[in-house]
């Protein structure tokens, strides 16, 4: 029998086998948001039946989205500027710029979210930090942010040792949560079945399902990074397999944690838990030691992971500048080869949002909602581009390109799912998105003029820019007039 190496095309002789590749996808995909997911869904009014249906929608949609990124990476390996490069290739420079902007601002907002979650977890051990958004928390978070910024400016990269600590800090509490509830028999079927489809005076079933969408997408934000990791495969066929297996493993873990949580305490009590809610759930199951372990895991995970988030936030506009989407100044590096302009600007934006979180008393949940709203722009554009090349049968004749049928199916499904997510964000989502994207227009104009290129060359570009400005102005009026407050 011919060996596997003889029967399969090799990408990289030194690449990773299927098992190691899948493990890397799993560790890269597990998000700190899982530690607060159960409480966040409960706070939205979702009972057991709605949560189960929501997970079903999430599985179909997120898997389709992951296959979109996987298919695009194989169909267009020449586009190396990040997922926003797909928007530029399909719909022009202005759409590509907005896609890059959304990805960048989402990274900055994610930094704020995790900083607030970090100090909320610290508040369990040191009550002075409160819910993570008081003055002491913001001051300490700011100091930590600029300490990490200084490290990145000196050329520090995310180290393997830090990755190991972050991975263990996430996996140990999650494993303990599952095992302790199962082995100690703490799961209560009566609690799980109570008000299964909703409370008599509560929100309707459809409203319950929609309320969970942002929280569910948040815990899967970053799946495009898992696709990049899958590109380290030794064999061609393992690229898609590792992505699918890794996603299935992470999804199963998340689903088990979510279902077990519903059998520990009633929804009304879960909705009142402090962030991270998993700590309160495990404390209810096994006592204070459970809360201590979860909070410690969150702290260790985020202290290490925030360095990576600072790097990601700075690399996004840097790569976009190199690709021609952002102004040339964003491509400047210092003597340590660090992207000095983007590091400072990204940390400055993060700092501004930290101040806003204190002034407006905004929570971790509000900022991750904003992060999801902004990252939906590159997600929608990527899915739309994959759908377009599928139905036009373009760029699908390469040696590693997906089939036409696969591109059409997952492109269309991914596009429908991302549009559904945009709809599920509601009026608040539209207001937040336009307000955050309006400042992008002068930055785009500066970059295009610096390269001697026409600004908003197409009619649809002008229309999009005009709509963003008008809706942003209306949104600001509605907010400050108290008609539709954003926060």
What is the predicted role of each segment?
Residues 1-52, 56, 62-70, 78-80, ...:
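Membrane-interface "cap" regions at the ends of multi-pass membrane proteins
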Residues 3-14, 52, 129-136, 168-295, ...:
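Helix-loop-helix junctions that connect adjacent transmembrane segments
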Residues 13, 18-19, 139-142, 234-236, ...:
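Loop-to-transmembrane helix boundary motifs in multi-pass membrane proteins
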Residues 42-43, 63-145, 150-153, 158, ...:
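Hydrophobic transmembrane alpha-helices that form the core helical bundles
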Residues 42-50, 120, 124-137, 157-166, ...:
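Transmembrane helix-loop boundary segments of multi-pass membrane transporters
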Residues 84-87, 92, 124-129, 199, ...:
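TM-loop-TM module centered on a large, flexible mid-protein loop between adjacent transmembrane helices
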Residues 136-187, 243-247, 372-377, 433-439, ...:
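Membrane-interface loop-to-helix entry segments
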Residues 333-334, 379-470:
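C-terminal membrane-solvent junction of multi-pass transporters and transport-like membrane proteins
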